[in-house]
Amino acid sequence: MPLDEKNVVSEHVLEIRHRAFGRLIDIRGLIADAVAAKGQMPVWSITDSRVDFKPSDEDQREVGFVSHRNIGYVVRSPYTRQYMHDRAMRFIRDVFAVEEYRMPDVVRFGFRSQILFPTRDTFAGLLKKTNERMPLPKQLNEVFDAQIEDYGQIVVLKRGETHIRLRGGPMEGEQAKTETSLGAQKDRIPEVGFFMDIDHWRTNPGPMDDRKISTLLQQVNESAWKAASAYHDILL
């Protein structure tokens, strides 16, 4: 059976770090009102140098944020693989539409996915399967279309200007609740599963408009799900 994103527990975090934008401090309220008026993220809160957004007071599945040094979006267990990209881009475009906001040059574009897919195996059984079937370096090259730079418990790859760091392994539910960011979804965490932590990043990409962000986000989001699917198919 192929990996069904609706049956996994996951969290996806986009963070775009840029050079300091001091004027953000003066326009926090303007950004809050403008983005809230668009309708996707109407609930906001302001701290010293940051504005956080949510779809509602009760909804903890999504968070958008903008500060004097970064802008980003978080989605927990999206309904589809495309959901993260579409929601994040709508939020970013809502912020960019504020006339007084201008994002400085980007110093780091990062996208991190933590994915836990369930298994019917015991922990010992899944560990045995993992030791027998874990992808070899050549297979990882094909999965990511990238060259391995380091290999061990953590694998580091590079595709063009994009770096990829991957770690994964069998995990019991209690460990997932306390040692990963998935603990916020503790009611959905299985007793045993295979955990993957996939980090894509690019340093100093310079100026980025919404089209460049959308293209790169689409690439790394697809790459993360492709990796999760490959591991799922190999192990289960």
Residue ranges of model-derived segments:
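N-terminal low-complexity, intrinsically disordered segments
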Residues: M1-R76
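Aromatic/basic-lined ligand-recognition segments
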Residues: F109-D197
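Glycine-rich, often proline-containing surface loops adjacent to acidic residues and nearby aromatics
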Residues: N7-E15, E62-P78, M103-Q114, P190-T203
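Short glycine-rich, low-complexity/disordered patches
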Residues: M41-D52, A97-P118, K138-R159, S223-L236
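Internal, hydrophobic cores of structured domains that mediate oligomerization or house catalytic pockets
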Residues: V66-E142
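Short, conserved charged micro-motifs
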Residues: F21-I27, Q82-M84, F123-A124, N204-T215
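Long, compositionally biased interface segments
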Residues: K186-L236
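Well-ordered, non-membrane alpha-helical segments in soluble/globular domains
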Residues: I31, M84-D94, I213-A227
